[in-house]
């Protein structure tokens, strides 16, 4: 990873070219959520109401002050439907950003979703039915992706059986919306997933 300089003026990766710098936070409170929600150009998705026992465990934003936030990731933890703990990271990103692929454990910049088959899961995103398809991921997790709000939406879950959470009626809300200003969400132990 090379920092910006006079030429080029963007962060750069030898394998991917220009990339958006990534900032992560493991202590997420209402002030931080409100501040970052006001700085990003893509949705900051959160399932509301939270599933019973679920907490917010981290936040990541890819982008800089000049270009704005090109991707967001909100990490949550709670009980898995089959017992034990589970983690969920919701990523919203512009085309070619790569945060979703990184979270899924692949080198993919975009999910490469094939919509020629029936979706593997469905959620409500900002009140709109949103189909999601299984995409490539590392073996220790499962990832689904689709389009919501004009950008990619990824849901990455650990362990893979936690994908059963998406069989529930999941409503994703964009925390950038003014109705969510000042909302206090339960905060859990910091995540290692970001």
Q: What would you call each of these model-derived segments?
A:
Residues 55-134:
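Short, solvent-exposed recognition patches
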Residues 39-40, 54:
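N-terminal, charge-rich interaction modules
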Residues 116-194:
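A short, solvent-exposed beta-edge/loop patch
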Residues 46-56:
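Proline-anchored loop/turn motifs at beta-strand termini and strand-loop-strand connectors
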Residues 51-53, 80-83, 147-152:
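Short, solvent-exposed coil/turn segments at beta-strand boundaries
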Residues 1-38:
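N-terminal cysteine/histidine-rich coordination modules
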């Amino acid at each position: 990873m090379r920092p910006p300089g006079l030429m080029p003026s963007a962060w750069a990766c030898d394998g991917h070219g220009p990339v958006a710098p990534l900032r992560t936070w493991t202590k997420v409170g209402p002030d931080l959520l409100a501040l970052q929600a006001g700085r990003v150009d893509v949705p900051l998705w959160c399932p509301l109401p939270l599933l019973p026992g679920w907490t917010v465990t981290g936040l990541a934003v890819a982008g800089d002050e000049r270009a704005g936030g090109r991707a967001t990731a909100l990490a949550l933890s709670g009980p898995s439907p089959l017992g034990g703990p589970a983690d969920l990271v919701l990523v919203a990103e512009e085309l070619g950003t790569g945060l979703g692929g990184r979270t899924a454990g692949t080198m993919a910049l975009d999910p490469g979703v094939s919509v020629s088959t029936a979706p593997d899961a469905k959620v409500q995103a900002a009140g709109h039915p949103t189909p999601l398809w299984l995409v490539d991921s590392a073996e220790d997790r499962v990832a689904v992706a689709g389009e919501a709000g004009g950008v990619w939406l990824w849901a990455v879950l650990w362990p893979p059986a936690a994908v059963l959470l998406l069989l529930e009626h999941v409503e994703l809300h964009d925390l950038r919306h003014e109705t969510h200003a000042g909302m206090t969400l339960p905060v859990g132990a910091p995540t290692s997933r970001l």
